[in-house]
Amino acid sequence: MSSDNIKVIVRCRPLNARETRENALNIIRMDEASAQVIVDPPEQEKSATQAKKVPRTFTFDAVYDQTSCNYGIFQASFKPLIDAVLEGFNSTIFAYGQTGAGKTWTMGGNKEEPGAIPNSFKHLFDAINSSSSNQNFLVIGSYLELYNEEIRDLIKNNTKLPLKEDKTRGIYVDGLSMHRVTTAAELSALMDKGFANRHVAATQMNDTSSRSHSIFMVRIECSEVIENKEVIRVGKLNLVDLAGSERQSKTGATGETLVEGAKINLSLSALGLVISKLVEGATHIPYRDSKLTRLLQDSLGGNSKTLMCANISPASTNYDETMSTLRYADRAKQIKNKPRINEDPKDAQIRQLRDHIARLEAQLAEAQANGAKPMDVLRIGKSLMKAINGDELNLDGTFQGTAGAKLSEARDGDSEGESTEEEIVFVEDEASRKAADELEAKRRALAEAKQKRESELEQKEALNKEAIVTLTDLKSQLSAIKNSVFVVKQLEIKDKVLGKAQQKLTTRQEKHNALQQALQNKQTEHQTKTAEILSAVEKLERLKADISKTEAEINEVNQEIDDITEQHALSIEEERRELKEVDKRSALLDAIIQTFIPQCEVAKAEALAEYDEETMKWAISPEKVDREHQMLLKRVRHMQILYPSGSTKPVFFGKGKDTRALVNFSQLSGNILELEPELPERMTVGEEMDGYQSYGMNEDEMHDTQLQMFYSQIDTYE
């Protein structure tokens, strides 16, 4: 299995209106001939750190400047990967860069200038339509997004989908809808429908900032007969639009947008770690750190041809982000993948679809031959049409519904209702259509036979013309031979003269060669002496050149260290800022809890909470809540109510060995922040009893009333 490095290209967009208002400078130079990107550090960067900063140069597989167009990039860089998919390879194209760098424009574009995805669709179906007649294709499309580490189907529904893995299918999204398409327009409509459901939001960097990573997946199956054997190749095309990395200080994100940005940066950090580990050749690659890296596992170091398009901004205000993106891309180009052609996979759906259609056709023929009821024939016919259109295709390659099973059920049970005239007409139309098809086939056969006969007649006429031309040529050649006899005699005389002249020339050439050799020896001796004289000077010049080159390399390495140090410091500052926001929110929640929630209730809530490692969220366990309710109800049912001597307020005791006072509910409203409480609408038990004394109740009546109120509270809680 041959290895293939990830291809990396870089595209730079023009300065936008915001950067122009900020008087940002263009610090990017592109050398498309040598595929190099030169980054000129802005003046403020030089003065703020050190004056020795020099332009940085990065080399990639291809670079495209601000004047490049989507179609030109597709033809030069993306098209070979689409061709590889048709050959049975897996291919991945993904765009990476900071927010607002032009990733979505490169991948999607618009109607006037379509991007990589629509251009891929058009090229894909152009190749399919021009393929040989013995090739059959099945094209299936799916569209998903990764939003806040949750996978969602952008076409069928917006519910969370689980990510699973098995030995035969590898890593897959369970429940992701698959849609069979037959034209590029249908595939583009599928993409437009999903794109409308994608999460976007406005930030200070981008008015339509993508808040999720999206992957459009196209599966192409090709069935072909080679040497009387059917061969099925399955190619998979992943078109990935990554959300941009962003800094909160530049985007101004708050609230939900800030949380989205944190999740985006977290997944991109995991992607960067995977790339670093792959470049280092580590034994353990942390693909499981993020769902993004799990989805791209085959594309990074696996069975796939991968192209990364790094999008950068030319503005001097984005120098740090641009350098980070270029370093990211420079590491990625060192990753080696191991792509292979996927021949006869176990999950090939084109064979299963063909077998399913054949079974339905056999069932339809059997039903018509056995005189089945029109309703049953209609049911099988509808199932056959759905199978032909691919409406019953599932993710696992099975098919919804079984017409044969339904037919058997119809035979065993009583039919409900009579067949309608419309159903009978359907069967008759089906028979008429088959007869028309047979007639059309015979007509085509006669036309082909006629065409073949005409072709044979044309070939015979061509042979006759060729024979006439050949005879004429032979006559001309015979005349030429007769004329050449005299010429041959004259040539023999000339050959003798030329032989003598050639001998004289050879003698002169030998003398010339001897003189030339002597001259060459003298020149060699002279060059040797000259080399001895100049060797010291040349050696000195070479040493000076080596010293200059080494100094330049040292300066470049020092600058790289300084840039990385600055980048690290900025990252730490950004993390501190985010941590400060988190601490502020945590302190606010602590203050609310300490002020308004009793400590005992906080402890109970903490005991009931559980942390979900997969979703990274706290949740209240229903089982623990149920156990807590049952335990509290059990304790309440076993309570005893006593009245201390001289007091009308009850005290509650547990039965049995535990005779300690449990809770004095009459005093729960006291001592809250040592503030004067507002008068509540509902009084506590003790206060109500004090009020009842003013109505002239005796102690027994007060006791009965108190018990009724207490148990009504228990029933309400239960």
Swiss-Prot record:
Residues annotated as binding ATP: 97-104
Primary localisation category: other
Residues reported in the UniProt entry to bind Mg(2+): 104
Coiled-coil stretches noted in the UniProt entry, renumbered to this chain: 432-477
Residue intervals of the Kinesin motor domain: 5-335
Superkingdom, taxonomy of origin: Eukaryota
Biological process, per Gene Ontology: cilium assembly; intraciliary anterograde transport; intraciliary transport; intraciliary transport involved in cilium assembly; microtubule-based movement
Assigned keywords, A-Z: ATP-binding, Cell projection, Cilium, Cilium biogenesis/degradation, Coiled coil, Cytoplasm, Cytoskeleton, Flagellum, Magnesium, Metal-binding, Microtubule, Motor protein, Nucleotide-binding, Transport
Annotated InterPro entries: Kinesin-like_fam, Kinesin_motor_CS, Kinesin_motor_dom, Kinesin_motor_dom_sf, P-loop_NTPase
Binding site for ADP: 100, 102-105
One GO term describing the cellular component: kinesin complex
PROSITE patterns in UniProt: KINESIN_MOTOR_1 (PS00411), KINESIN_MOTOR_2 (PS50067)
One matching Pfam family: Kinesin
Gene knockout outcome: Knockdown of expression by CRISPR interference (CRISPRi) system results in significantly shorter membrane-bound portions of the caudal flagella.
Localization per record: Cell projection, Cilium, Flagellum; Cytoplasm, Cytoskeleton, Flagellum axoneme; Cytoplasm, Cytoskeleton, Flagellum basal body
SMART domains in the record: KISc (SM00129)
GO terms assigned for molecular function: ADP binding; ATP binding; ATP hydrolysis activity; magnesium ion binding; microtubule binding; microtubule motor activity; plus-end-directed microtubule motor activity
Subunit (UniProt): Monomer.
Protein role: Involved in anterograde intraflagellar transport (IFT). Involved in flagellar assembly.
Family to which this protein belongs: Belongs to the TRAFAC class myosin-kinesin ATPase superfamily. Kinesin family. Kinesin II subfamily.
Protein name as annotated: Kinesin-2a
Organism: Giardia intestinalis (strain ATCC 50803 / WB clone C6) (Giardia lamblia)
